Amino acid sequence: MADGGSERADGRIVKMEVDYSATVDQRLPECAKLAKEGRLQEVIETLLSLEKQTRTASDMVSTSRILVAVVKMCYEAKEWDLLNENIMLLSKRRSQLKQAVAKMVQQCCTYVEEITDLPIKLRLIDTLRMVTEGKIYVEIERARLTKTLATIKEQNGDVKEAASILQELQVETYGSMEKKERVEFILEQMRLCLAVKDYIRTQIISKKINTKFFQEENTEKLKLKYYNLMIQLDQHEGSYLSICKHYRAIYDTPCIQAESEKWQQALKSVVLYVILAPFDNEQSDLVHRISGDKKLEEIPKYKDLLKLFTTMELMRWSTLVEDYGMELRKGSLESPATDVFGSTEEGEKRWKDLKNRVVEHNIRIMAKYYTRITMKRMAQLLDLSVDESEAFLSNLVVNKTIFAKVDRLAGIINFQRPKDPNNLLNDWSQKLNSLMSLVNKTTHLIAKEEMIHNLQ
């Protein structure tokens, strides 16, 4: 504190009036000896009387030593009720010094780690959480105690209660806490929210982490944990493009790049999820950027699969399954499969979505090369029924991926986009100007020829 002052619980900053350090140096060893002889209650009364004097005189160092000594003696004597009572009593004393309370709480936090008896540990945690509630100067200790309590609840099978307890903490506002520890707390909040399937809250909590933090040193483990949690979240949301970006972030991590098997699995997931993502400008841009990665050469099947979606040619689903099905779903000894198309409900859904992306790719190709096509012909090219083809086409039109108009009576699809009236008028005006310029030039050339012949 500035000028050697101490801060009281009411916020006032006071200077030390009397130095009791010599008295405390003399009394503490005497009290420790008496406590070991079993006269703990007598010792505590003596120390409480001395604490009043040091507190009134604003001697922060001596007050801290007395508070720590009281809880230490109670702990060593295993007088748990007395320990909890004195923590409450000392923290609530009138005009108590903040630094002294902080020292006492820090000492008690070490006891929480050492105590093995669960009911005693839980009671001490509850007492300390009660004492630290609403006090900024012990907010870090309160956060750590809350995390310990949440861990105990989770170990006892009460995951919902653990998530609820940990969510109370708004650690992103704790300026005194190190950034790394803050991120660890937020990741733990995300993990527990995912465990109880609270996806909306997980999404909100995830926004509290700035991903630029992961560019700092010694953050790779936290980075991988964060992106794995985000993958779980976005898999529930079905946001394939976001999952692809998360896997790219994992793929770009140095510790993943250092191990061939790990980066290959990450890159395979990147390729598969970008293919699974519905087509739009961002997806198309990402596909071409991923295609330029030289490391794709080491997983040729996945490189060829990605190339199919960048080539302006029709694909047959049956051929794709024949060529890539086994590699994507089962893998091989040299190239293990990812869990994207695993034999789970989610894996089957993604396999179905892959088929949908093949169909959508084919319809986009048709829209590029055809101006008009019959429904029957389109269904034949897509290996689908007419109704299924129409459903896919309608979906792409609604999403504004392509333009198409269907004449259902004639069974004809028109891919030609109608021109805007202003553009039509501009085209007409431009062509008319071009025609008049041509007529003018021709007239001029005729007149020139006539003049030359007249001269002759």
From Swiss-Prot:
GO biological process, one term: proteasome-mediated ubiquitin-dependent protein catabolic process
Cross-link type Glycyl lysine isopeptide (Lys-Gly) (interchain with G-Cter in SUMO1), residue numbers: 92
PROSITE patterns per UniProt: PCI
Modified residues (N6-acetyllysine): 221, 368
Chain positions of cross-link Glycyl lysine isopeptide (Lys-Gly) (interchain with G-Cter in SUMO2): 92
GO CC, alphabetical: cytoplasm; cytosol; extracellular exosome; extracellular region; ficolin-1-rich granule lumen; membrane; nucleoplasm; proteasome accessory complex
Gene3D superfamilies membership: Winged helix-like DNA-binding domain superfamily/Winged helix DNA-binding domain (1.10.10.10)
Subunit structure: Component of the 19S proteasome regulatory particle complex. The 26S proteasome consists of a 20S core particle (CP) and two 19S regulatory subunits (RP). The regulatory particle is made of a lid composed of 9 subunits including PSMD12, a base containing 6 ATPases and few additional components. Interacts with ERCC6.
Pathological condition linked to this protein in its record: Stankiewicz-Isidor syndrome: A neurodevelopmental disorder characterized by delayed psychomotor development, intellectual disability, behavioral disorders, mild dysmorphism, ophthalmologic anomalies, feeding difficulties, deafness, and variable congenital malformations of the cardiac and/or urogenital systems.
UniProt function note: Component of the 26S proteasome, a multiprotein complex involved in the ATP-dependent degradation of ubiquitinated proteins. This complex plays a key role in the maintenance of protein homeostasis by removing misfolded or damaged proteins, which could impair cellular functions, and by removing proteins whose functions are no longer required. Therefore, the proteasome participates in numerous cellular processes, including cell cycle progression, apoptosis, or DNA damage repair.
PANTHER family: 26S PROTEASOME NON-ATPASE REGULATORY SUBUNIT 12, 26S PROTEASOME NON-ATPASE REGULATORY SUBUNIT 12/COP9 SIGNALOSOME COMPLEX SUBUNIT 4
UniProt protein name: 26S proteasome non-ATPase regulatory subunit 12
Organism name: Homo sapiens (Human)
Gene expressing this chain: PSMD12
